[in-house]
Amino acid sequence: MMPVFTKRLELRTDAENDILDLTGEVQQAVEESGLDAGVATVFVPGSTAAITTIEFEPGLARDFPRMLERFAPKDIDYEHQKAWHDDNGRSHVKASLVGPSLSVPFEDGILTLGTWQQIVFVELDIRPRRREIVVQVMGEAETESRS
């Protein structure tokens, strides 16, 4: 049976389009797992937030929300809002485009991310939120018999 380690992260967001770098926390979960090689999955429960990778720098932190706005603009009618009257139909659409999870392989206990690639959480709801992020690490521990 493959070992599984789960860690939960608690986040608070201030506004729509908050982007938070989770790379350090995910790497820490890999280290805490004691596993040598495998995959780390990062997942956000809910339908108005997303997990992805990006070069986490100020320019892209502004560009990414603007790109999402083109796919799901504020100024159109969303059927979701007619049903729920919560004004966040666009939040659900954006979140479904980006997705709620990401899996990253690791080797020798280190995430195999590119030099300019960070794991980020993206808040897409229209109000501040408390979020729980689930990091699940699966893999193999290094053994002396491995060659």
Name the predicted role of every residue range.
Residues 1-147:
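Active-site histidine-anchored catalytic micro-motif
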